[in-house]
Amino acid sequence: GIFDVVKGVLKGVGKNVAGSLLEQLKCKLSGGC
């Protein structure tokens, strides 16, 4: 149903946000920013 679609989208967005935050953290830790 539509709720499954919404859940899927939210999961995807959450993964993307978490991934970009992790990348920023790695960048700062390695001093490459």
Swiss-Prot record:
InterPro entries: Antimicrobial_frog_2 (IPR012521). Coiled coil: none annotated. GO terms for cellular component: extracellular region. Disulfide bonds join C27-C33. One of its GO terms (biological process) is defense response to bacterium. Belongs to the frog skin active peptide (FSAP) family. Brevinin subfamily. This is Brevinin-2DYd.
